[in-house]
């Protein structure tokens, strides 16, 4: 399966717009473009029962973040602090940058 074009990047602040974590915000830790999913810090936490191994000699129940579908998160604009859709703008020097569709502010610095 080909990698999907993602509207968010690592370290972006996002708000969950659908699902059990709806309305919560967090920072993106990982982007999985092959699956179209993102891992958001301290959201969608699941418990995994792990066996003892060389890394984790104790074993037991481990809590970790599970991936969310990228369509269920919206980028939070740093200027207006609202979840927003983004557009792409080409600057004078030819570089592409994302901008907020609500306040028209540049998101990438």
From Swiss-Prot:
Q: Does the keyword Ribonucleoprotein apply?
A: yes
Q: Which InterPro entries does this UniProt record tie to the protein?
A: KOW (IPR005824), Rib_uL2_dom2 (IPR014722), Ribosomal_uL24 (IPR003256), Ribosomal_uL24_CS (IPR005825), Ribosomal_uL24_KOW (IPR041988), Translation_prot_SH3-like_sf (IPR008991)
Subunit structure, as described in the record:
Part of the 50S ribosomal subunit.
SMART domains cross-referenced by the UniProt entry: KOW
Q: What does this protein do?
A: One of two assembly initiator proteins, it binds directly to the 5'-end of the 23S rRNA, where it nucleates assembly of the 50S subunit.
According to its UniProt entry, one GO biological process term is:
translation
GO CC annotations? ribonucleoprotein complex; ribosome
Question: To which protein family does this belong?
Answer: Belongs to the universal ribosomal protein uL24 family.
Q: Does the keyword RNA-binding apply?
A: yes
Protein source organism: Syntrophotalea carbinolica (strain DSM 2380 / NBRC 103641 / GraBd1)
Q: Which HAMAP family match?
A: Ribosomal_uL24_B (MF_01326_B)
This chain belongs to the protein called: Large ribosomal subunit protein uL24
Please give the Gene3D superfamilies that the UniProt record associates with this protein: 2.30.30.30
The UniProt keywords, alphabetically, are: Ribonucleoprotein, Ribosomal protein, RNA-binding, rRNA-binding
Q: Which gene encodes it?
A: rplX
Instruction: State the Gene Ontology terms under molecular function.
Output: rRNA binding; structural constituent of ribosome
């Amino acid at each position: 399966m080909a990698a999907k074009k993602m509207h968010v990047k690592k370290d972006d602040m996002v708000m969950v717009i659908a699902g059990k974590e709806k309305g919560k915000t967090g920072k993106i830790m990982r982007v999985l473009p092959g699956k179209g999913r993102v891992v958001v810090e301290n959201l969608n936490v699941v418990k995994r029962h792990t066996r003892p191994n060389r890394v984790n000699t104790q074993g037991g129940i481990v809590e970790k973040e599970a991936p969310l579908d990228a369509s269920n998160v919206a980028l939070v604009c740093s200027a207006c602090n609202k979840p927003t859709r983004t557009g792409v703008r080409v600057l004078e020097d030819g570089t592409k940058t994302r901008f907020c569709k609500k306040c028209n502010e540049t998101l990438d610095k």
